[in-house]
Amino acid sequence: MKKIKLMPDYGCFPIWGMDDDNFGNIDPYSLPISKSLAEELLVWSNKYDKTLNIEEPLNSGFENIEKENIFKYEGEKLFKKLKLELGDQYTVIYPS
């Protein structure tokens, strides 16, 4: 069983391989999931990318706690969808 992590990072896909033979950033379209879920994952990741303050990286983050909580809630929903679509083929981790 493959192990992946759902975790946004600036300028990266939101899926990370956690196995020795599948380690690193993974394009959601390369996974056996629906196109619509892959698109949702990328939209979610783009929301995170928009929080980056290039000039002052230490000041990066969401505008307020409400937007951050909404983002986390969306991540939890995507985590559940990802687990459902991948079934027993993958172990999915989401550090909420």
Regions found by a protein language model. Name each.
Residues 1-96:
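Intrinsic low-complexity, intrinsically disordered or marginally ordered coil/linker segments
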